[in-house]
């Protein structure tokens, strides 16, 4: 599914990155080591972490996009690194549980 479709259907805020990127999986976690060990490539990652290390983790794993929940803001350095590495950054005012359920309903597993 195109990330742009997910943005439209869930009313997410687009921060940076190519909305035409395709994702196949969803993954919700705030522990970076867990994401490194368990997330799959071509994933949309749902989290409350906003620091620059999330971009490094996403790049290593092959995660295509990140949804930051609970109305949190990305750090400037995170946005800059995401642009450099082609990672899509999105935001939601909803909590991770609600966003995860909606992403699941769209068919990402």
Regions found by a protein language model. Give the residues of each.
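Absolute protein N-terminus
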Residues: 1-2, 109
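Feature captures the catalytic cores and cofactor-binding loops of soluble hydro-lyases/lyases
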Residues: 23, 32-44, 48-109
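Short, structural beta-strand-to-alpha-helix junction motif
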Residues: 2-3, 95
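N-terminal first-folded block
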Residues: 3-43
